[in-house]
UniProtKB/Swiss-Prot annotation:
Function summary: Antagonizes telomeric silencing in yeast. May recruit SIR4 to non-telomeric sites or repression.
Post-translational modification Phosphoserine, affected residues: S137
Subcellular location field: Nucleus
A Gene Ontology molecular function term of the record: transcription corepressor activity
Matching InterPro entries: Apc4-like_WD40_dom (IPR024977), Ebi-like (IPR045183), LisH (IPR006594), WD40/YVTN_repeat-like_dom_sf (IPR015943), WD40_repeat_dom_sf (IPR036322), WD40_rpt (IPR001680)
Compositional bias per record (Acidic residues), positions renumbered to this chain: 130-140
Alphabetical keyword list: Chromatin regulator, Nucleus, Phosphoprotein, Repeat, WD repeat
Ranges of residues in domain LisH: 4-36
Protein name: SIR4-interacting protein SIF2
Extra remark: Present with 1620 molecules/cell in log phase SD medium.
Region (Disordered): 104-140
Amino acid sequence: MSITSEELNYLIWRYCQEMGHEVSALALQDETRVLEFDEKYKEHIPLGTLVNLVQRGILYTESELMVDSKGDISALNEHHLSEDFNLVQALQIDKEKFPEISSEGRFTLETNSESNKAGEDGASTVERETQEDDTNSIDSSDDLDGFVKILKEIVKLDNIVSSTWNPLDESILAYGEKNSVARLARIVETDQEGKKYWKLTIIAELRHPFALSASSGKTTNQVTCLAWSHDGNSIVTGVENGELRLWNKTGALLNVLNFHRAPIVSVKWNKDGTHIISMDVENVTILWNVISGTVMQHFELKETGGSSINAENHSGDGSLGVDVEWVDDDKFVIPGPKGAIFVYQITEKTPTGKLIGHHGPISVLEFNDTNKLLLSASDDGTLRIWHGGNGNSQNCFYGHSQSIVSASWVGDDKVISCSMDGSVRLWSLKQNTLLALSIVDGVPIFAGRISQDGQKYAVAFMDGQVNVYDLKKLNSKSRSLYGNRDGILNPLPIPLYASYQSSQDNDYIFDLSWNCAGNKISVAYSLQEGSVVAI
């Protein structure tokens, strides 16, 4: 039983046509004899034959695992049968059974031999040994290279719309629901009768009054925002009618901050925990004194003939952005009209600076405390890096074709972003270019979060799937391939570390959040209950 290369070319050509890849099919048609085969076999080969053959090969590889060396059927492992067996795992098993011939000795290619002879001096020998050591360290750092880990759900949550983990306690999760209630929960692994399982214990319920929204008149009052202070001792909750409440980590109410009249979209604490800034969907931004609960500044930016002013009773205009950020204990930035970013001091009513460059609403603002640079992302599909005292961006990254939903710093020289165009991109400030790329065609990304240690990046797709990318492994491969060279010819693929799929169709994801240890992710779904998955 065999298949020729020309027959395989024909099946690939048929597959390209069936999937609508017309350009690829045309290229294959020009370079092979597929049209001759099509005349002979078109009526006898059904649709999807190539996929069917690959699936049968995967099944054959798995069935081989169930038969021992003597030909007897092995005992069935229920846990093994419940797991997904995919193409990557089948190829890995085949590679272990039939390893490739090493290119050494008489199997070494002539070109390799010549290059080895040309590089026999001491310096080049040391360089080759260093490169080999780097490659070996990469391979040994991931024993399951090629495998995609399937994440397991450990705890079911209620029908949540947002969630955030305590920044210092890896077991405490705050999550908000549609019924104006947020909850503080502790999630720990326990041991009972020799079996380990995860247990969720409710610490407190953080309740808002069930009131109508002042702007929309909606009868719902769901929790739209949650924000822990940097020391993890306090949390702010925001709801649809604009009310903010301040709580301690045991659930005791500390203060009620009531000035907004529209759903809250962003809340940020300053480093010392004395002030917060909040923003609602009507572009109203308020600076609060946390200790007294009083309003220190009130900004309501709108466009009037190309300029921005503070206006009263402003509503109905388009969103200027959905994020705010502190750049110091007494300085912060907020979105302004026409894609501008305004810089304010807590003691000044007028802006002290204006950053111009974006041409759409601001979706992300994130300040790096180490290099003192501000990262911004916009619905115009661009990311920009700003340096204090300069109104023009020092870096501008183009590549996304739709709105950017998440952007984060990866160390001091790189930023990672994801967009509704389905792509995840890693950028370098020093080289001012794209370093790595991952694209899932046709599936928009709704959320993205980086782990606290910066080693993994989780993205949530519209179809309910969560992908976790391995940034640590990507960084190692990048150093091995390019070293300290400035030129990057082609972006690297971003290694996929793990994946998790919703069990319900058409169940997109509202929100993601990492715990501080980087070993758990909370997921908020549109239809079913929320989940906590273990990494």
